[in-house]
UniProtKB/Swiss-Prot annotation:
Sequence segments annotated as region (Disordered): 1-26, 222-266, 344-364
rRNA-binding keyword on record: no
Protein name: Gephyrin
Biased amino acid composition, Polar residues: 1-19
Subunit structure: Homotrimer, homodimer and homooligomer.
SUPFAM superfamilies: MoeA C-terminal domain-like, MoeA N-terminal region -like, Molybdenum cofactor biosynthesis proteins
Region (MPT adenylyltransferase): 260-718
A Pfam short name: MoCF_biosynth
Length: 718
């Protein structure tokens, strides 16, 4: 999907200009066209799935007509489009929609502080009148929930006969903002179009307007999964540095669950979850370490590398032949000796000045040459090399040169490949075999690379036993722990296939921790002091013994507790901050250490899939990937593939379907074959899988032959 084109999603039938301009006095129903515009570079390029735009469409369809009452004769039609974060594209769409007399335009995204957040700058010049009351209402509602709302820049106003409101990009914030403004929108549209009574619900015309509005607002906020609170825990001992638009918890969690049977965490979109994780990576103290070049394969350079000497550092022959003086031209040459690779070529200087002789040609001054091999040093006094194919031996130590030569012909001059002081490798470059050869050529033995993160791996659950346990020693109801060895080997496999992002020496296999609060707490706190990253598996669902999530709310900061994906919905991401004191200087300020905690679901497939999607980008960022390309290399590579199977879609969540892909030389494209049943407990679905199909959240099927994106998790064997 091009980032210069507008993308339309046919959620509803789009009206034509003729329909909008048609006189409808004879019709029973009046049409209100509502435009929903998502501004996002990533969505417009097809590298992210939009959650916000469809959420607005769903709210409008489910709530707006309901607020206007059953007796209302207005037919609400929604049009949904996506444009990149470009002022020109945003303004073009807004202008088009207002010209078509859309009643309401709602934008989502681009209202923050980053350089690409330009929605307010695009909308503001188009407005005839600002509606600051709507802006204030949205800000007040959000500020009552989180102080991070002050980082939002909403704009609302009127252009011609259209009400325009900018909403944040977060699904959660959209529900909050629409919850407060939606009850007033029908009346506002009526006033703009000089029909105040026809669009105002009867209940809202009374003195109970505020009360009824609040009821509608709550209805919107809780319409999906009864979203009670946000992704973040309000922990007084930890600061949440995430600038996303989120709530904090204001109620107590009892470890092990409570009587409440719904999750208190919203479903975070995958892209938003990855963004939160990468932001928290900035809090890790990532130093440079000195690495011997033969051990640096796959690492990322943490500094520019410059040559300390020219290469070559002597004049070298490019070919086998004879070194001559170009001015001597065609003729007979006396062979003075040989210059071979590794030889200094000394004592082979032609005599000066040359004197006439009678040895071969009495008419010419005698000419001299040196036989030379490829890579050998050009002796002083010579400035050209003649290929051996263009010469002839005509006597003992006599050579006939049959062609003329130019100065410098077939000679590598000093520094012609690499001049002294030249930057040969840049900070952020990945070190491969060729880079190691280049470093060795220049005599560079050590390089500085970002220090690889230290990792602790923990499996949780009373039902687990060590994977080495014998069957006859296992009690009924006990299973072997497969997650710890799987994760430990995936860490090594990822480094082998996609670049070094962790070291085997830095992996701490903690083992199995039972479902006991104190055991788990002590282990997490101990690992947080030693490791940059903690990876746990299990204990994040809704069972009364799922202790990991409520415990992390107490000892750390939970940034999100559920992700909108299949498999892996319970994935939780947290940080634990500890302090250390320098024993040599008690007056020195205490140092803070942040540890990233990835709490993966316990089902083996969910564990592996969430590892690839969320842990790997963090590992790659801490390992230096993305330094050179502003983070574009952090996710695993993605390719487009043709399906060889008919695949069932999930209408509730996007799905990551395990498959094997290979290159089809006849079709000239990648093709994918499903690994079969995709149950999250079926580890066989990962057998031979080298990719994850990115399937949309949708009813129905994707037919055989459809083109979809696939995330590579292993090498393509053909």
């Amino acid at each position: 999907m091009s980032n210069t084109l507008t993308t339309e999603r046919n959620i509803t039938n789009s009206p034509t200009a003729a329909q909008l301009n048609e006189k409808e006095s004879g019709k029973k129903e009046e049409e209100w066209i509502v435009g929903v515009l998502t501004t996002s570079d990533r969505v417009s390029q097809g590298i992210a799935i939009d959650q916000s735009g469809p959420e607005i469409v769903a709210i409008i369809k489910n709530q707006l007509k309901q607020m206007m009452g059953e007796s209302c004769s207005i037919n609400v039609i929604t049009v949904y489009k996506v444009v990149p974060d470009e002022i020109e594209h945003i303004q073009q769409m807004i202008t088009q929609w207002t010209h078509l007399k859309y009643k309401l335009i709602l934008t989502t995204g681009g209202t923050g502080f980053t350089p690409r957040d330009v929605t307010p700058e695009a909308i503001k010049p188009l407005l005839n009148r600002r509606t600051k009351g709507i802006e204030i209402a949205m800000l007040k509602t959000s500020l009552d929930i989180t102080p991070h709302a002050m980082l939002s820049r909403p704009i609302a106003g009127i252009r011609d006969q259209t009400l325009i409101i900018t909403l944040p990009g977060s699904v959660k914030a959209i529900r909050e903002n629409l919850g407060v403004v939606l009850p007033a929108i029908p009346h506002a549209i009526g006033l703009i179009n000089s029909k105040p009574k026809s669009s105002l619900p009867e209940s809202h015309r009374s003195k109970d307007y505020i009360k009824n509005s609040q009821i509608d607002s709550n209805l919107i906020i809780n319409q999906n999964n009864q979203n009670n609170n946000n992704n973040n825990n309000n922990n007084n001992n930890n600061n949440n540095n995430n600038n996303s638009h989120n709530h904090h918890h204001h109620h107590h969690h009892s470890c092990g669950g409570s009587g409440k049977r719904g999750s208190s965490y919203n479903m975070t979109p995958v892209d938003e979850a990855i963004k939160i994780i990468l932001e928290q990576c900035d809090n890790i103290n990532n130093e440079l370490e000195k690495v011997e070049i033969t051990k640096s394969l796959g690492r990322i350079l943490g500094e520019d590398i410059s040559s300390v000497e020219p290469f070559p550092n002597f004049r070298a022959s490019i070919k086998d032949g004879y070194a001559i003086r170009s001015k001597d031209g065609i003729g007979k040459y006396r062979l003075l000796g040989d210059s071979v690779a590794g030889n200094t070529g000394e004592n082979l200087i032609p005599p000066q000045p040359q004197q006439p002789t009678n040895s071969i040609n009495d008419d010419d001054n005698e000419k001299y040459c040196v036989r030379i091999t490829t890579g050998a040093k050009i002796p002083d006094g010579y400035d050209s090399v003649v290929m051996i194919e263009e010469t002839e031996m005509i006597g003992e130590n006599m050579v006939s040169i049959e062609v003329t030569c130019k100065p410098g012909q077939d000679i590598r001059e000093i520094g012609s490949d690499i001049a002294s002081g030249t930057i040969v490798l840049n900070k952020g470059d990945k070190i491969g075999c060729a880079e190691i050869g280049l470093l060795a050529t220049l005599g560079i033995q050590w390089v500085h690379c970002p220090k690889l993160p230290s990792i602790s791996i923990i499996s949780t659950g009373d039902e687990l036993t060590d994977y080495q346990s014998k069957s006859d020693s296992m009690k009924s109801g006990i299973i072997r722990d497969s997650n710890s060895p799987t994760l430990a080997t995936i860490l090594q496999e990822i480094s082998n296939h996609f670049g070094e992002c962790c070291s085997r020496d830095n992996i701490n296999l903690v083992g199995i921790i039972p479902d006991k609060l104190e055991n788990l707490k002590d282990t997490l706190l101990d690992c947080s002091k030693k490791s940059d990253i903690i990876i746990t598996s299990g204990g994040v669902s809704m069972g009364h013994l799922d202790l990991v999530k409520p415990l992390l709310e107490k000892i750390g900061t939970v940034h999100f507790g559920r992700v909108n994906m299949k498999p892996g919905k319970p994935l939780t991401f947290s940080t634990i901050t500890t302090t250390t004191t320098d024993n040599n200087n008690q007056e020195e300020e205490k140092k803070k250490k942040t540890t990233l905690v990835f709490s993966l679901p316990g089902n083996p497939v969910s564990t592996v899939v969430t590892f690839y999607l969320f842990v790997v980008p963090a590992l790659r960022k801490l390992g230096g990937f993305g330094i050179k390309n502003n983070g574009s290399q952090l996710n695993l590579p993605c390719v487009e593939v043709k399906l060889l199977d008919r695949i069932q879609l999930d209408h509730e969540r996007p799905e990551y379907h395990r498959c094997t892909i290979e290159w089809d030389f006849q079709e000239h494209c990648f093709v994918s074959k499903s690994t079969g049943s995709q149950a999250s407990c079926r580890l066989l679905s990962l057998k031979q899988a080298n990719a994850l199909l990115v399937l949309p959240q949708k009813h129905g099927h994707l037919e055989k032959g459809s083109m979809v994106k696939a995330i590579l998790i292993g090498p393509i064997n053909n």
